[in-house]
């Protein structure tokens, strides 16, 4: 089955990534288990810098790459060049993904290699691929997320690209772990981090008599990447409108249902406290807080329904 690029194909800066990189047990999954985070990050940057030439060649500008990797403001030029060179060697020696030549004080020359035959140059995939948006680097998520969250973000992008219910898609942790050669713990950790950062939404199925251990994630929804500076501006607006104490209290409630980075939900909680009183709102969130993380009722919709139910019971 050939999966073609969708409507984001014309967006400058989007990066084409093959499913092979994620599924091949010798590549991304191995980087995850070996904690080769910087090699993982650098390889994605190399794909970003690749212009599609037939030789797989890239001129590696250290300053530019260091900026993408979040190293430029943290290290001297000598420091980030050394770190990048170390990751280049890992990509060559441990993963057979590249070949390269270094020149003192100058840009490096890198050649991407084929996944199937390292003796041949890399070529952009014609099927079974997906796109990582430029905002992943532009907004700094490439250096803000944990390694597990980065991997899970790519999984989300890959699956939503083949989903008939886009932007929603479905799978279990067990299936994902087996397919991508990483632990179920890494899947859970990465997905939960993305959920709490408001980068994905998650719905869980209702066990209907089955034990919670048999629960599967019903579906995941990829949400648009936002600029962290935008989020801070939204908090400033709410702080100005309602005061810091009310904002902080609402964010604490929102955290119970993993919406502490969603300004709309936080403001709605503030308004609910105004309309129904803190006692009612607190009771509803206390009920939700007793649910397991993977319980379908550990969500803001359930809290709102609980508040409404309590209000109807006491007209």
Residues of each region from the PLM?
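Electropositive, intrinsically flexible nucleic-acid-contacting patches
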Residues: 1-274
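Short, cationic/aromatic linear interface patches
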Residues: 271-315
């Amino acid at each position: 089955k050939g999966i073609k690029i969708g409507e984001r194909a014309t967006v400058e800066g989007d990066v084409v990534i093959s499913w092979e990189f994620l599924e091949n047990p010798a590549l991304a999954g191995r980087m995850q288990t070996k904690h080769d985070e910087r090699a993982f990050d650098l390889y994605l940057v190399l794909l970003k810098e690749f212009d599609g030439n037939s030789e797989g060649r890239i001129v590696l500008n250290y300053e530019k790459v260091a900026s993408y990797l979040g190293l430029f403001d943290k290290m001297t030029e000598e420091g980030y060049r050394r770190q990048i060179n170390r990751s280049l060697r890992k990509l060559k020696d441990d993963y057979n993904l590249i070949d390269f030549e270094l020149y003192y004080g100058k840009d490096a020359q890198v050649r991407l290699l084929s996944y199937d035959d390292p003796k041949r140059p890399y070529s952009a995939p014609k099927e079974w691929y997906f796109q990582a948006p430029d905002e992943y680097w532009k907004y700094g998520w490439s250096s803000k997320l944990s390694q597990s969250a980065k991997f899970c973000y790519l999984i989300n992008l890959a699956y939503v690209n083949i989903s008939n219910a886009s932007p929603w898609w479905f799978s279990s942790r067990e299936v994902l772990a087996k397919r991508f050669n990483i632990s179920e713990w890494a899947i859970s950790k990465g997905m939960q981090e993305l959920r709490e950062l408001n980068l994905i939404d998650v719905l869980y199925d209702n066990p209907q008599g089955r034990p919670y251990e048999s629960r599967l994630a019903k579906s995941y929804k990829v949400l648009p990447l936002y600029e962290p500076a935008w989020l801070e501006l939204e908090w400033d607006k709410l702080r100005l409108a309602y005061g810091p104490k009310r904002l902080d209290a609402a964010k604490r409630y929102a955290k119970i249902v993993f919406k502490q980075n969603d300004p709309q939900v936080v403001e709605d909680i503030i308004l609910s406290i105004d309309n129904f009183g803190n006692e009612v709102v607190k009771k509803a969130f206390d009920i939700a807080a007793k649910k397991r993380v993977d319980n379908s009722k550990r969500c803001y919709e359930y809290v709102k329904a609980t508040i409404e139910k309590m209000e109807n019971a006491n007209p």
